[in-house]
């Protein structure tokens, strides 16, 4: 197993005493899931995690369980694909001019 991230996040601090605290996992080893391409950037995943935690704290929601690793990876893939599509559209529009 990988070591936990060294960067403290708000989610880690909130869940420091619970069993849901973040642990870095090797998805291939733990779940035998083939990874088709590179994982999302760790800084992007941390940013999504921090934003979601701050949003839940601000709105009074207590569902920190929804911030598990697979949800964060899924959101990371989604944001990465969305950004790639935006850049591609901008480049195509620029080439047309």
Swiss-Prot record:
Domain of life: Eukaryota
Pfam families cross-referenced by the UniProt entry: UAF_Rrn10 (PF05234)
GO CC terms: cytosol; nucleus; RNA polymerase I upstream activating factor complex
Classification via InterPro entries: Rrn10 (IPR022793)
Coiled coil: none
Keywords: Cytoplasm, Nucleus, Transcription, Transcription regulation
Gene Ontology BP annotations: transcription initiation at RNA polymerase I promoter
Subcellular location: Cytoplasm; Nucleus, Nucleolus
Subunit description: Component of the UAF (upstream activation factor) complex which consists of spp27/uaf30, rrn5, rrn10, and histones H3 and H4. Interacts with rrn5 and spp27/uaf30.
Primary role: Component of the UAF (upstream activation factor) complex which interacts with the upstream element of the RNA polymerase I promoter and forms a stable preinitiation complex. UAF seems to stimulate basal transcription to a fully activated level.
Name of protein: RNA polymerase I-specific transcription initiation factor rrn10
Provenance organism: Schizosaccharomyces pombe (strain 972 / ATCC 24843) (Fission yeast)
Source organism phylogeny: Eukaryota, Fungi, Dikarya, Ascomycota, Taphrinomycotina
Gene: rrn10
């Amino acid at each position: 197993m990988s070591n936990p991230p060294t960067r403290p996040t708000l989610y880690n601090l909130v869940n420091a005493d619970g069993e849901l605290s973040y642990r870095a996992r090797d998805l291939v080893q733990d779940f035998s899931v083939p990874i088709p391409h590179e994982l999302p950037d760790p800084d992007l995943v941390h940013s999504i995690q921090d934003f979601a935690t701050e949003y839940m704290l601000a709105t009074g929601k207590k569902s920190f369980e929804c911030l598990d690793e697979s949800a964060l990876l899924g959101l990371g893939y989604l944001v990465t694909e969305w950004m790639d599509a935006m850049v591609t559209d901008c480049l195509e529009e620029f080439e047309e001019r």
